[in-house]
Amino acid sequence: MEKRKSLFQLAVPIFIETLLFMLLGIADIFMLSQFDDRAAGAVGASNQVIGNLNLIFAIISAGTAVLVAQNVGAKNKREIERVCSISLVMNFVIGLLVSITMIFFGDVILTKMGVTRSLMGYASNYIKIVGGALFVQSILNTVTVIIRSHGYTRESMLITVGMNILNIFGDAVFIFGLFGAPVLGVKGVAIATTVSRILATIIAFIFLFKGLVPVSMFKYLYDKPVGTFKKLIKIGFPSAMENMSYSLAQTVIMSIILLNLGEQAYIARTYIWTLSWFVVLFSISIGQANQIMIGQLTGAGKVEEAYHTGLNNFKTAMLFSVLGGIALIIFRRKLIGIYTDNQDIILIGSITLIVDAFLEPGRTFNIVLINGLRGAGDVIFPVVMAIISMWGLGVTTAYYFGVVLGLGLPGIWMGLILDEWFRGVCMLFRWRGKKWVRKVMV
């Protein structure tokens, strides 16, 4: 019972935090759409660039999460301080370089993306303000990862809740001119986003230095930092590559749908992706909690406990995934009907949701078990399998089933199922084989 309680103590705040980020994005776009449709489109395009840049920060953050969790388990305070100080400074420097790039070359990047002239004015304002302050986001990402890896997911969630409430309030003030404020539109949204992130970063630092690590930890920047830097990259780079591979594969599949199946299939895909995300949230939350638990247990040398904890967490996530899949099947037409009354889209979407119910358990395999392997420091095997399976199996069979065999969007989903289940079974064999035991870095 204690293990399960520990899982939910970690996973529930992560679930709420991730859900709030999702809802914040929806609220931003909704309020901007009331101001100007072009403003909503411009922010969407800018956020695509910013989202890709956040993957750069994820390299250091992923390494930080694993090393901090393992050293918390090992009770190695000196190494925790060393990792924290080096990762914070590294992501700050990287974030500063990215921010400068956005200020001076943001417009160029947007133009290369194909952002039209009518959207450019809004997009330019947004990317220069939010993109120009990305160094704040890079620091915030690192601090919250450190807090989470100590097991304080509730505190991380509360920081995020406060940031999101302030962000939405600021959006409303500057979009609708509340309390006599000027109507700034996109520029106001950008200011609200940046200010909320700055305040969240300050609060996160206060919690970090008050209860977890001392300010004096920065002395380790001068004490042989190269070894720690190498460890951060050794774990972080493969983890980021895996996410990049997935993102790129999904982009290619989106293009296959647009070019071969038409607009209605693409619209249906967008709605299905949004609906399935609510099921995936459970796996993501449990997966991230699993990484923290495995990191701390392996760091403490409790390998057998880590092994069984990983399997138990996987079974819990699988239960939620199966139940979520059943709900998608039962309510498929009503769920798609929330978004559209177009009967063709509802038909395509409802059929594909039936197929998606079989995809979600496969996705759970990968999300939970890969996070477990990552927590133990085993990061090369997942990224190698990701590249082989996503491209050799997922993309190719999605095209074959969906386009060549003429099965349409459900055929695309069948290809995704093959990828997720093949990789997932490989991850399960990897976990059961315990080769990850040799990858622990403390």
Language-model segment annotations:
Residues 1-14, 68-135, 181-236, 294-359, ...:
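Short alpha-helical transmembrane segments in multi-pass integral membrane proteins
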Residues 2-30, 34-35, 51-63, 67, ...:
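N-terminal transmembrane alpha-helices
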Residues 3, 15, 27-31, 39, ...:
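Hydrophobic alpha-helical segments typical of transmembrane helices
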Residues 9-25, 129, 163, 196-200, ...:
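Transmembrane helical elements of multi-pass membrane transporters/channels
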Residues 14, 18, 29-30, 66, ...:
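Transmembrane alpha-helix boundary and packing residues in multipass membrane permease domains
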Residues 23-41, 110-117, 173-184, 244-278, ...:
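Helix-terminus/linker motif at the lipid-water interface of multi-pass membrane proteins
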Residues 40-100, 137-156, 254, 258, ...:
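Small-residue-rich hydrophobic transmembrane alpha-helices
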Residues 61, 130-149, 156-164, 189-204, ...:
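Short runs within selected transmembrane alpha-helices of multi-pass transporters and secretion channels
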